[in-house]
Amino acid sequence: ALMLGMGAVLPEPEYELPLSGEGEAAVYVVGRISGEGSDRKPAPGDFQLTKTEIRDILACREKYAKFLLVLNVGGVVDLSPVMEVGNILLLSQTGMTIGDSFADVLLGKAYPSGKLASTWAKWEEYCPVGEFAQPDDTRYNEGIYVGYRYFDSVGKEPLFPFGFGLGYTTFEVGRPQVEVAGTQVRVTVPVKNTGAALGKEVVQLYVSLPSGKLDQPYQVLAAFGKTGQLAPGQEEALILTFALERLASFDESTAASVLEAGDYLLRLGTSSRDTRLCGVVRLEGEVMVRQLSHVGGKPDFEDWKPENPSRVQEDLAGVPVFPVKPEAYQPKLIP
């Protein structure tokens, strides 16, 4: 069969589902059609839940002691009307064996251990910039403020932050050890399963760049790693590494990717909103990482910037500082 209208909003079905509360558990599945070549719409049945979905989800939560909301979707859905639901499984659209995978997770033969690759928020909380009406003349006014970079930089609270995700157990992220050798940053951190079930955890390393002449978001994801399967009480040392030059920013005035002098704050955690400061890389001078050239001309618009960026004065007392000389870098010329 050929289905036309990818990304279309289907009409809401009309039905009356008797919810007596009988049985031990209830599962409610929210589905969406995915597509490409068009934006999501702030409408019920697409980005937003329909009245019927909200009604039935809240009814199931009220009448069943064990209730699971399953999201068989390819993108974000505004869950703000049903945030009181305690168990939400993001199944996504993972192919023809999705039913087998879901059954394994539901019956305890497998466990969820993923993390969100996008920020989930109310529709009105997303960055109100961009002109995407014409596919052959698109102005990406949002600049660097895409996804979590926007939410973290302007201080807006999402429903679920970038990198968030729970499983059937809990974890403790221990005290990290930071090492800096030349341009390489290495963070070793112990992760312990403190719950009663098997599981895996993902640890994420973010970096806040110095605020110099170039505009910067509050933080950027520099590295992440996932443990192997950990039994209750089991611990693993996770190693995260990245090269500082990967954080270089483009300077339009010189057509070069540069690292500005200053403090690069290392933040370790399990989501973009759950981090702690674990180290500072102090670059003692500006570094030109790559010399490029202007070949596409200058755009006819200015990138959007927040009026009041979410920047706080960090207390660096007790935080290890690693000085780095600019001479540690070898610039590259890209014609």
Language model: regions and residue ranges:
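C-terminal non-catalytic regions of proteins with extracellular/luminal or membrane-system context
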Residues: 1-335
